[in-house]
A protein has these predicted regions:
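Membrane-embedded alpha-helical bundles of multi-pass transporters/translocases
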Residues: 1-273
Length: 273
């Protein structure tokens, strides 16, 4: 199903000159945080979640699920905001050289922002799927993936004549959210194991607020450093400053808003060990 989804995007791209490269580079950018966060939760929390669900520990499973979701959102939402707010800075510094010119940067940045909107959905899918697998239900996730495939095809093909190559990115993002909604709906029959507790609901809102604060700070910083980002010898340094400001502002806003607890983060890591 994943390969067919990729094929849909490529088929759309062949009708637009340069689109294959734009979508490829945009996909590489949003796959980076997706891979990092996926590895983090896969190593730290998912083994504990799967183990508890297999032995029928519903309360422990719900706790593990919610803390995994909390950590996922803590890492994913700011990445999403960054991909939406400063895609041009990221693309220009990382890729704009040689035959890759300013117009390519603009097109790739647009696709990056669209892909970024689907990042939380793709990460949260990794949390919901073990809930099904722990109960030896592999058919439901496969059926949900087929639904997502249809959504991808309808959106990408249906919109391509109106909005061009970005229809492929919109299709992938909409498919990601459709898959997540299906997983969430299907997991309801498993009871409390995959339900959001009060702490997760409260902190997810605070994480979003902290990420928006970070986004505003990063946007201002990127505008201020725009001349630096155009200098060949200083571009990487300028981007490093922007990302450093992003991390610092998010950490400060998160602490002030109560978006995370350092003690709980340490406890999650110790539990995984």
């Amino acid at each position: 199903v994943v390969q067919v989804n990729l094929l849909v995007g490529r088929q759309i791209a062949i009708y637009f000159e340069g689109a294959n490269a734009w979508l490829y580079y945009a996909d590489r950018l949003y796959q980076l945080p997706l891979g990092v966060v996926g590895v983090a939760i896969g190593i730290v929390l998912l083994p504990d979640l799967s183990r508890r669900l297999r032995v029928g520990d519903e309360a422990g499973g719900q706790e593990a699920f919610n803390r995994a979701a909390e950590l996922s959102l803590l890492l994913t939402i700011p990445c999403t905001v960054a991909l939406v707010v400063i895609p041009s800075a990221l693309v220009s510094v990382l890729f704009e050289r040689g035959a890759f010119v300013a117009s390519d940067t603009q097109a790739t940045a647009l696709a990056t922002a669209i892909y970024g909107l689907g990042l939380p959905a793709f990460v949260l899918q990794k949390l919901y799927q073990p809930v099904f697998f722990a109960r030896e239900d592999t058919r439901s996730p496969f059926n949900f993936a087929l639904v997502a495939l249809v959504v991808n095809a309808v959106v990408a093909i249906g919109l391509s004549r109106y909005i061009g190559f970005t229809a492929a990115a919109y299709g992938a993002t909409c498919a990601g959210w459709a898959m997540l909604v299906c997983l969430w709906w299907g997991a309801r029959r498993f009871g409390a194991a995959a339900s959001w507790d009060a702490q997760l609901r409260k902190r997810s809102l605070r994480i979003l607020l902290a990420s928006l604060v970070m986004g505003a700070v990063v946007w201002i910083t990127a505008r201020a450093l725009e001349p630096v980002l155009q200098m060949a010898g200083l571009r990487l340094l300028g981007l490093a400053v922007i990302l450093g400001v992003a991390g610092l502002s998010y950490a400060l806003a998160g602490r002030l808003l109560g978006a995370f607890s350092l003690a709980q983060l340490r406890q999650m890591i110790r539990r995984a060990d």
